[in-house]
């Protein structure tokens, strides 16, 4: 599908107003679709779709990830950590890093000689905290999160109000920035493909 932005735009083209698809055994028509935006940063939802059937309407809020994407959050700041993990973010990170503290103690702080990609004379000032969906090297470990907390991270449930209640096509829509589905398949060619291949975030976390 090419680059990430182009892939998102292509999915939105599939989901243009008036497009029909079958979801949970019922036929729906797209009433509104767009990419949620906010003043600073980004919501978790990449593609917002409001569709209706003859019986009801449904909000489909997709977080789109490339199949080879490793990072959930790269070079995380304190502000971003609180948004992802909630008010207990310090304890969560502290407990998770303490679980692998021996790995940190084994690392040199001052490099008298070069080592791997570290140059001679380098001094370790600290480490950056990154959240990945798989093991990422010598200093990686499993985050000590409950299933519900993992769902919150993927969905963006703890994000700030402006990111949760994002703007879609000029309209502020409540919780439009909180994703409820994830799509990791780049091989989609129609609206129905998108619907068939997206996975509920809660189900994805439990896989």
Residue ranges with predicted function:
Residues 2, 19, 23, 55-206:
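Catalytic cores of nucleic-acid endonucleases
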């Amino acid at each position: 599908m090419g680059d990430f932005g182009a892939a998102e735009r292509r999915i939105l083209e599939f989901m243009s107003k008036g497009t029909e698809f079958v979801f949970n055994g019922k036929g729906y028509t797209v009433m509104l679709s767009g990419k949620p935006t906010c003043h600073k940063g980004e919501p978790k939802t990449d593609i917002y779709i409001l569709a209706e059937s003859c019986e009801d309407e449904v909000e489909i809020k997709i977080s789109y990830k490339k199949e080879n994407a490793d990072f959930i959050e790269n070079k995380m700041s304190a502000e971003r950590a609180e948004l992802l993990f909630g008010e207990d973010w310090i304890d969560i990170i502290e407990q998770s890093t303490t679980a692998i503290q021996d790995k940190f103690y084994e690392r040199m702080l001052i490099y008298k000689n070069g080592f791997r990609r570290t140059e001679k004379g380098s001094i370790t000032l600290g480490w950056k905290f990154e959240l990945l969906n798989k093991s990422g090297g010598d200093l990686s470990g499993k985050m000590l999160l409950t299933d519900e907390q993992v769902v919150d991270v993927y969905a963006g449930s703890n994000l700030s109000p402006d990111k949760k209640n994002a703007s879609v096509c000029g309209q502020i829509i409540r919780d439009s920035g909180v994703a409820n589905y994830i799509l990791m398949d780049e091989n989609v060619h129609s609206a129905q493909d998108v619907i068939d291949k997206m996975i509920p975030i809660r189900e994805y976390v439990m896989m």
